[in-house]
């Protein structure tokens, strides 16, 4: 497994408190796979962002082979166990179920229990007409929210 890390300045975090969130509690995550079925596809990337030491830390876990999936899962869930809120984009429909199926396939005991999930796609979708977005792809939502 290859681990890549990069730090970014935190900027103004006041918007988080207005939403009832604390940066230290959050973990943003996304996965990349070779397909949609956890039984047939492979997990090759878990990306996460956490607030650490006054900066945002981006961590990417890359699989070099199929055998790296277990190590990636264990590493990610060790990080997740220190956080209270999980933020994703369409994570509740794809990323979380995909990882849960892999955990089950490998007989691993890690889980998402005790972590509150906030799926940005699910939160934005009901406001489709109000927001007048061209579509609900991640890039369109990022632009609307002012995220680079």
Task: Give the ranges of each region predicted by the language model.
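N-terminal accessory regions of nucleic-acid-interacting proteins
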Residues: 1-24
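Short, charge-rich binding segments
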Residues: 18-21, 36-39, 77-82
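Two-metal-ion RNase H-like nuclease active-site motif
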Residues: 25-34
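C-terminal or mid-to-C-terminal helical accessory/interaction module adjacent to the motor/catalytic core
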Residues: 146-148
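RNase H-like nuclease fold core
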Residues: 33, 37-52, 57-58
């Amino acid at each position: 497994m290859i681990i890549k890390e990069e730090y970014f300045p935190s900027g103004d975090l006041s918007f988080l408190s207005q939403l009832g969130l604390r940066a230290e509690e959050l973990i943003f995550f996304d996965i990349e796979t070779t397909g949609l079925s956890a039984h047939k596809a492979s997990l090759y990337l878990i990306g996460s962002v956490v607030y650490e030491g006054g900066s945002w830390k981006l961590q990417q876990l890359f699989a070099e082979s199929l055998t790296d999936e277990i190590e990636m899962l264990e590493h990610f869930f060790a990080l997740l166990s220190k956080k209270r809120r999980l933020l994703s984009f369409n994570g509740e429909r794809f990323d979380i179920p995909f990882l849960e199926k892999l955990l089950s396939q490998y007989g691993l005991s890690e889980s998402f229990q005790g972590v509150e999930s906030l799926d940005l796609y699910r939160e934005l979708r009901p406001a489709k007409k109000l927001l007048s977005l061209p579509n609900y792809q991640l890039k369109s939502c990022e632009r609307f929210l002012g995220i680079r």
